[in-house]
């Protein structure tokens, strides 16, 4: 072979090798072919654009060196200023890095977003991507994956973030959740409620309540119909928001109704739903419809303990005895100047401050009718958990408050008055009591632009920056091609790869801003967890899914580290599933802090819960912790709230499949926290939770449909919850009464029939004989009867007759009044 030809072939091989190291980058077009990628280094040019030019899709810089993969309106005033109007994001709360991140339509047909280290941050939901040929950005703003016949296999319209676009269906499975500037999900949800009514919901761990339609009016007065279970809505091209729950064909109509206007329906971080219309001449946006015309009616606007009032503009203030937690972010609300706890509570050192024409909506411990002001006061002051009470003059209605959320003032004609409980040592001035006064001459404006701001460090670059830009990898390829012989090229290639395969711990530790953004959920190296657990020295427990060890992280957080066993998923799928679980946050669910996926190691890092499992306390012989009635009822309620959140509220609904006392942990205040949720997916024993067939749960807690091989739904958790209720009441493990699965089911059927017969009568003396002999008296027999009745309904053979966990929560709350 002639030398020039050999040199040319050698150069071509070298270039091919280097180019093969990186995914194919797609240029600006509406189609992403199978096997192609959009790469973050070329984010300004490597985009998809709808055929009519209205929408673009690609990497959007949310912070320095931090990107989301998003869809945006192409021609707007904001886009020209590089502040694009985002209508959908794959990873709104988990940005990827500015180097080596890519969105790839893989050869198997799935679309995956990977971070700089190759970790899958997001992937398209679905199980069947057979025959996929391309991804396409449609003129509607819908990003779709299509097969060879042009059929849609997946679409972004099915998983909206904070915006609905015209022609996009609003269904029972879709919801809007705003993203704050700190890239965390907001506290508001727009979705169909369980009454099939399109609703705005304020949702935080302590409370979840609807504020639109107006909860103080009945639905019919608001033009809504709760008797249509269709749950279907849509924003039309003309600016009409129609929904199946709107009575008599009503609809919400834009002020500029008509065709030819570009629109978007967005749930903003302040909790208001707004319809925006674009001005074609300059690309600016204007509000053409708003759900909440009075901002103070938005629940939680001023955060916990805060009060919204008009002076005359909407303003947030703290009540007497409270101070602003973060002046730049009112969603954090107010904190008590003097914090009182139940272990040091002395009602003689407490007093009440009257806040006229004021209310904290919801969070009532109970509702009492026709009682005196003194009686209402005595009820609250005798309860260390009561923060204050609302009292209505004339009707004698009394509402003791467990929490102080959604505070607001009303016109002077309103009869609602809050009596705030404060230590006697806290001084109070009448000038500090918030009031709505349209004649106030010095209004303190509610700065909506600062409502959700959180100062964050910019993301630092993981590489040392020099003259290289987004084409740095091609630069190395050409240098190697022209200056390095074949033998030295091989050595350089190995160095090139290994240099960048840094250990995860080294990469994370070197990036303070990046680590800060992902500190709520991050990846740990195996070496970090070996150190944290002191080589897995202290075992906390073990089960079918793995062994749990106690550990302490470098930031002194105490954690539980679980070594998962029998994980057969690939690394990318495991990390993608965990990215969903890591976003789940509820006060009755154990918080997942992170994971390790290194080689064959699969570990979960979660918060350490001090008092261990309910099983240890409930069933251990000679235990030194005895649960009183109040504690047991609170555990039943807390577990119900946690399961209701998994089934109905979190962004991706989760079936636990193994609810039992071992998976219910108790913190220092004996508040229950459910653990091991989401492990059905992680352990890959049956695939999707919509079609689980191999996970069998634990003997004594498994629902009949497991045995019948029926499709598994959330009702399996309801059944297991019913068994847990029986064990809470009796203090005895059901499975120990008999042996074998069939015998347990047979015994439970007899027990359910016996309890059902007892519940038909008015007699209550039999309840004492059924309850745990170790139970400290007194017992609230109304609550006991409610728990027994709920357990019986949860243990129905026919799963369609079992209640939902949301219904269970409401049942228990009504008994708690």
UniProtKB/Swiss-Prot annotation:
GO terms for biological process: recognition of pollen; response to other organism. The keyword Protein biosynthesis does not apply. ATP binds at residues 540-548, 562. Expressed predominantly in the shoots and roots of young maize seedlings, and to a lesser extent in the silks. Glycans are attached at residues 83, 128, 228, 279, 329, 339, 452. The keyword Repeat does not apply. GO terms for molecular function: ATP binding; protein kinase activity; protein serine kinase activity; protein serine/threonine kinase activity. It is a single-pass type I membrane protein. InterPro entries: Bulb-type_lectin_dom, Bulb-type_lectin_dom_sf, EGF-like_dom, Kinase-like_dom_sf, Pan_app, Prot_kinase_dom, Protein_kinase_ATP_BS, S_locus_glycoprot_dom. Pfam families: B_lectin, PAN_1, Pkinase, S_locus_glycop. Residues 342-424 form the PAN domain. Residues 29-472 are extracellular. Residues 292-328 form the EGF-like domain. The chain crosses the membrane at residues 473-498. Residues 534-817 form the Protein kinase domain. Keywords: ATP-binding, Disulfide bond, EGF-like domain, Glycoprotein, Kinase, Membrane, Nucleotide-binding, Receptor, Serine/threonine-protein kinase, Signal, Transferase, Transmembrane, Transmembrane helix. The active site is at 658 (proton acceptor). Its main location: membrane. Residues 1-28 form the signal peptide. Its EC number is 2.7.11.1. Residues 499-817 are cytoplasmic. This is Putative receptor protein kinase ZmPK1. The gene is PK1.
């Amino acid at each position: 072979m002639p030398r020039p030809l050999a040199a040319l072939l050698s150069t071509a091989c070298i270039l091919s090798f280097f180019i093969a190291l990186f995914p194919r980058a797609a240029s600006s077009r509406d189609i992403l072919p199978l096997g192609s990628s959009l790469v973050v280094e070329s984010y300004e040019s490597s985009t998809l654009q709808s055929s009519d030019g209205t929408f673009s899709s690609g990497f959007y810089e949310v912070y320095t060196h931090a990107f989301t993969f998003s869809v945006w309106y192409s021609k707007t005033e904001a886009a020209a200023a590089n502040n694009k109007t985002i209508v959908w994001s794959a990873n709104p709360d988990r940005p990827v890095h500015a180097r080596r991140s890519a969105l790839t339509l893989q050869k198997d047909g799935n679309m995956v977003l990977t971070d700089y280290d190759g970790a899958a941050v997001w992937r398209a939901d679905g199980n069947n991507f057979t025959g996929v040929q391309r991804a396409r950005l449609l003129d509607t703003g819908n990003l779709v994956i299509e097969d060879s016949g042009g059929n849609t296999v997946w679409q972004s319209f099915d998983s909206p973030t904070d915006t609905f676009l015209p022609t996009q269906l609003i269904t029972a499975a879709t919801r809007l959740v705003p993203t704050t500037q700190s890239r965390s999900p907001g506290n508001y949800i727009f979705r169909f409620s369980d009454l099939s009514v399109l609703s705005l919901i304020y949702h935080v761990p302590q409370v979840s309540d609807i504020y639109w339609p107006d909860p103080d009016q009945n639905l019919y007065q608001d033009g809504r119909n709760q008797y249509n279970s269709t749950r279907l809505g849509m924003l039309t091209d003309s600016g009409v928001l129609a929904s199946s729950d709107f009575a008599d064909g009503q609809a919400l109509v834009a002020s500029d109704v008509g065709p030819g206007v570009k629109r978007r329906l967005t749930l903003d971080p302040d909790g208001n739903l707004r319809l925006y219309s674009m001005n074609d001449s300059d690309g600016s946006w204007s509000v053409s419809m708003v759900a909440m015309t009075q901002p103070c009616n938005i629940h939680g606007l001023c955060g916990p303990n805060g009060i919204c009032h008009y002076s005359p503009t909407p303003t947030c203030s703290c009540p007497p005895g409270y101070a602003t937690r973060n002046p730049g972010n009112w969603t954090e609300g107010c904190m008590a100047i003097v914090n009182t706890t139940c272990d040091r509570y002395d009602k003689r050192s407490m007093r009440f401050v009257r806040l006229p024409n004021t209310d904290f909506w919801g969070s009532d411990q109970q509702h009492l009718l026709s009682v005196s002001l003194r009686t209402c006061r005595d009820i609250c002051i005798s309860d260390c958990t009561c923060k204050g009470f609302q009292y209505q003059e004339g009707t004698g209605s009394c509402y003791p408050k467990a929490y102080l959320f959604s505070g607001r003032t009303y016109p002077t004609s309103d009869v609602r008055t809050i009596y705030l409980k404060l230590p006697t040592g806290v001084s109070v001035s009448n000038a500090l009591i918030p009031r709505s006064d349209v004649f106030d001459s010095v209004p303190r404006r509610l700065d909506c632009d600062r409502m959700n701001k959180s100062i964050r460090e910019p993301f630092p670059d993981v590489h040392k920056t020099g003259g290289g830009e987004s084409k740095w990898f091609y630069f190395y390829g050409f240098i190697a091609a022209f200056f390095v012989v074949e033998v030295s090229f091989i050595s350089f290639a190995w160095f090139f790869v290994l240099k960048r395969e840094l250990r995860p711990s080294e990469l994370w530790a070197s990036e303070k801003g990046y680590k800060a953004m992902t500190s709520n959920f991050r990846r740990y190296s195996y070496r970090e967890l070996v150190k944290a657990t002191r080589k897995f020295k202290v075992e906390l427990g073990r089960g079918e899914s793995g062994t749990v060890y106690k550990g302490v992280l470098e930031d002194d957080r105490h954690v539980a580290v679980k070594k998962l066993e029998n994980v057969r998923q690939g690394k990318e799928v495991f990390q993608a599933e965990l990215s969903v679980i890591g976003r789940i946050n509820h006060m009755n669910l154990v918080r997942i802090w992170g994971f390790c996926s290194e080689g064959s190691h699969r570990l979960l890092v979660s918060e350490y819960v001090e008092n261990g499992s309910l099983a240890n306390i409930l069933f251990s012989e000679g235990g030194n912790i005895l649960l009183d009635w109040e504690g047991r009822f609170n555990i039943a309620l807390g577990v119900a709230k946690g399961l209701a959140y998994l089934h109905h509220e979190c962004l991706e609904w989760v079936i636990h499949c193994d609810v039992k006392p071992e998976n219910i942990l108790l913190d220092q205040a004996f508040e229950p926290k459910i653990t091991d949720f989401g492990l059905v997916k992680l352990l890959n024993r049956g695939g999707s939770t919509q079609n689980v067939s191999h996970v069998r749960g634990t003997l004594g807690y498994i629902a009949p449909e497991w045995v019948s091989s029926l499709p598994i739904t959330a009702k399996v958790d309801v059944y297991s919850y019913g068994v847990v209720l029986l064990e809470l009441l009796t203090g005895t493990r059901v499975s120990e009464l008999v042996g074998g699965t069939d015998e347990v089911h047979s015994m439970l059927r007899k027990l359910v029939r016996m309890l059902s017969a007892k519940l038909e009568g008015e007699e209550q003396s039999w309840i004492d004989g059924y309850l745990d002999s170790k139970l400290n008296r007194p017992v609230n027999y109304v609550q006991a009867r409610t728990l027994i009745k709920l357990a019986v309904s949860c243990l129905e053979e026919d799963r369609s007759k079992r209640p939902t966990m949301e219904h269970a929560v409401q049942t228990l709350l009504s008994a708690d009044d």
